[in-house]
Amino acid sequence: MTEVFTIKQCLDGEISIDETVTVRGWVKTRRDSKAGLSFISLHDGSCFSPIQIVATDQLSNYHKEVTKLTAGCSMIATGKLVASQGKGQFFEIQAESIEVVGWVENPDTYPIQAKRHTLEFLREVAHLRPRTNTISAVTRVRHSLAQAIHRFYHEQGFFWVHTPIITASDCEGAGEMFRVSTLDLLNIPKNDKGQIDFSKDFFGRETFLTVSGQLNVEAYCMAMSKVYTFGPTFRAENSNTSRHLAEFWMIEPEIAFANLEDICKLSQSMLRYLCKTVLEERADDMDFFNQFVAPGCIERMEHIADSEFEIMTYTDAVKALEASDQKFEFPVSWGLDLQSEHERYLAEVLCKKPVIVTNYPQEIKGFYMRLNDDGKTVAAMDVLAPGIGEIIGGSQREERLEILDRRMDECNLNKEHYQWYRDLRRYGTVPHAGFGLGFERLISYVTGVSNVRDVIPFPRTPGHADY
């Protein structure tokens, strides 16, 4: 039996010319010549480019099946791998047999025709959109970035911790969470005060889908020293923007005996590593994005890979923004959060490279961030990248119980819900720090695909959970 190869193996020159190979995949296009030849463009997802299958009318099923192949049909082809006579390709397969595995019913109504489709349309056929050039390229880049993240942290001595999806804690303190419940909605139990009695629920208390793995991974940081979590998180924000998803993935490292400077260095090393990796491993896909989606994205990745990031305090950033001649839509003032236009000005105009802004006012940051000695700012950091603005957010955590309790009171958080988190400060507390990187935000930045709904397989947004 002839060995089965991927199209990537065939096109990468791993196989000798004139060797008989078998490939499997889906038809992109088919064109016929008057000389009794059919040229079939076949893809299998292993690389960006399809391979051309040349079929002659000498095949036993040529007239009955081969000439009826349309976009989306699945097939298995066996034949000799030869140097291609056509332009734009180095190799093709001279078919000795073609087996049609699956036909497309009603080819005229098949959604993924051989033409360019808008990303908005493709979201309506999310189960078929991986067959397009853009989404398949995004998927391969996503894979390479995910593998690179695990490799980077493994090489740095980190342990991957699988934090829970179901939680009783709100890391962000924002309250925009998805509730998890098995209570009968038609017969909800009530307590003496007329409130929902969550003691009758599955977990015996109110529970939610996690908004972040940070609090849980901090617990393992206090025993394993260097850990990270990489998994799905959920936000019940009713936001219909190109930057928001209800379900998305986060990378969250946490380091014991560490301060703000340590995570600034780690974030820079990680981003540089990821940019280098994607340029090396996904050159064909990045060429596509650079040519058709976001011209200049390769140069942008090269720039980040080779740059030393600028570091400035929030106070200095505000002063620089106030001193600029730029007219901003949103006001700039100490104590207000930086908006995307401010972040991009700092990275693109002022510094012309990635910027790490540190030491933000405590009022605009999370309760768990370490209060600085000035009593006004916390040891927080945001990494701002040219072309997108904030891409990473992190901080040194508050390891002093009395100050953590005070911050929780100021944020009106119920300490009973965070008792285990407070225990970490009571039993062998140490300075520690970490950050979060939204995975879809990273993929969007790398590929230039501007809407995060197009860089996750099945996007979850307000009013949309169809697949």
UniProtKB/Swiss-Prot annotation:
The keyword Protein biosynthesis appears for this protein: yes
Keywords: Aminoacyl-tRNA synthetase, ATP-binding, Cytoplasm, Ligase, Nucleotide-binding, Protein biosynthesis
GO MF entries: asparagine-tRNA ligase activity; ATP binding; nucleic acid binding
Localization per Swiss-Prot or TrEMBL: Cytoplasm
EC number annotated for this UniProt entry: 6.1.1.22
Alphabetical list of CDD domains matching this protein: AsxRS_core (cd00776), EcAsnRS_like_N (cd04318)
GO CC aspect terms: cytoplasm
Entry keyword annotation includes Glycoprotein: no
Subunit structure: Homodimer.
Name listed for the protein in its UniProt record: Asparagine--tRNA ligase
Gene (name only): asnS
